[in-house]
Amino acid sequence: MHGTVSLRLTDSPARDEIARHAVIVLAVRVGMPPVAADRAGTAVGAAVRACRGGVVTMTAVIDGESVEIAIEGGDDAWRAEWTAALGAFGALAQAGCLTLSLRRTPLRAL
């Protein structure tokens, strides 16, 4: 499946939970195990919660076995802090947004 999902998250008390659940669904869709998907969702939810004021926009591009997520919002300090915190998910700060990539963990033969 290929597609794009966009969320516009206004400054409300529930936006971190909305972001968390959206990331969990996307991660499971591309084949991540549920525990890993929950870990990714929780981390992104925390990042969205820490983003003060304004609107946060999340855009996810699904490409079969991976999903690329761009989070727009926050300032340079927020992006720098959360790029480090989301490093396990390949987070990068670029062009005014924070991007990360979620992929299925490849299985290895024993």
Q: Model regions: which residues?
A:
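Conserved beta-strand-loop-beta-strand hairpin that lines the nucleotide-binding pocket
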Residues: 1-5, 48-110
